From Swiss-Prot:
Short name of any one Pfam family annotated for the protein: LCM
Name of the featured protein: Putative S-adenosyl-L-methionine-dependent methyltransferase MAP_4191c
Keyword Methyltransferase: yes
InterPro entries the record matches: Ppm1/Ppm2/Tcmp (IPR007213), SAM-dependent_MTases_sf (IPR029063), SAM_mthyl_Trfase_ML2640-like (IPR011610)
UniProt cross-references to SUPFAM superfamilies, sorted A to Z: S-adenosyl-L-methionine-dependent methyltransferases (SSF53335)
Length: 314
């Protein structure tokens, strides 16, 4: 399951970058079972179990308490690194993007593009206005698996769902147009949980391409972490490796530090602002507070400053 990124690598939902989509879905399942849930994703648990990664299936189904995966290096229960906060983290993230799409479509946007859609089931669970077209873009194996699994569950999309089975490193704009996408119409775009898995220059290309394909009035939502302070990158890698080691003790072999791209990069919000987008941003720490969740610990500065950004192309 574990592997370091390399040129031209591919994956399914049980390997490499693909399994992070399954992790995210497991967290959505956990968040859905919370006493006062912020989100309601009833497709998350069955999709995770269909993938079949044992640890994630047990987390999604409630058979494993995520606190069992914590250790003393996570700090207190309020730490963003603590697995017991995994569901809270994903709840506020999911709610943010859900509300972004619902607000965009209420404003009259009828064309939606979800980049790196993974096990995202928004095309099935959100109350889309009539006439909305949702394009899901991801690796062919990921698209095929989710489409089949949801059909087996008897699920029906609540919008017109069009799949675009293409690697984002390939000519995905051509594939998107071939599926019926019209760049002359305003679009609601999401790049959720994506930017950190791209090299810095690829992130810029992606944001440039989104801008090129956006008619005035288009909207975009994404999230990004600040560049690490001097010396912080190695500490972050060590922490990720420690978490991966604990996962291995439960039979889940994934090297998170080998999947993301480190190094200096343009932060998404100022980069987009310089390319014609009028933006708003909020930190994940602010989202926790706004949703009545216990605050993150002060030692989680970088995670607490994760910036959620949305805006309109002018």
């Amino acid at each position: 399951m574990t592997s370091t990124r390399y040129e031209g690598d591919t994956w399914d939902l049980a390997s490499s970058v693909g399994v992070t989509a399954t992790m995210v879905a497991a967290a959505r399942a956990m968040a859905t079972r919370a006493d006062n849930p912020l989100i309601n994703d009833l497709f998350a648990e069955p999709l995770v179990k269909a993938v079949g990664v044992d640890l994630l299936s047990r987390l999604a189904g409630g058979e494993l308490d995520p606190a069992e995966l914590n250790d003393v290096h996570d700090g207190a229960a309020g730490s963003a690194g603590a697995m017991s906060r995994m569901a809270d983290n994903m709840a506020v993230r999911t709610k943010f993007f859900d509300e972004f799409f619902l607000n965009a479509t209420k404003a009259g946007i009828a064309q939606v593009v979800i980049l790196a859609s993974g096990l995202d089931a928004r095309a099935y669970r959100l109350a889309w206005p009539a006439g909305t077209v949702v394009y899901e873009v991801d690796q062919p194996q990921v698209i095929d698996f989710k489409t089949t699994a949801l059909a087996q569950l008897g699920a029906a999309p609540t919008a017109e769902r069009r799949v675009v089975a293409v690697d984002l490193r390939d000519d995905w704009p051509a594939a998107l147009r071939a599926a019926g996408f019209d760049p002359a119409r305003p679009t609601a775009w999401s790049a959720e949980g994506l930017l950190g898995y791209l090299p810095p220059e690829a992130q810029d290309r992606l944001l440039d391409t989104i801008t090129e394909l956006s008619a005035p009035g288009s909207r975009l939502a994404t999230e990004s972490a600040p560049n690490p302070a001097p010396g912080e990158e190695e500490k972050l890698k060590e922490r990720m490796q420690a978490i991966s080691q604990r996962w291995r003790a439960h039979g889940f072999d994934l090297d998170m530090a080998g999947l993301v791209y480190f190094g200096e990069r343009n932060e998404a919000a100022p980069y987009l602002a310089g390319h014609g987008w009028r933006l708003n941003s909020v930190t994940i720490r602010d989202l926790f507070a706004a949703n009545g969740l216990d605050p993150l610990d002060d030692d989680d500065t970088r995670m607490g400053e994760m910036l959620y950004t949305w805006g309109i192309y002018e």
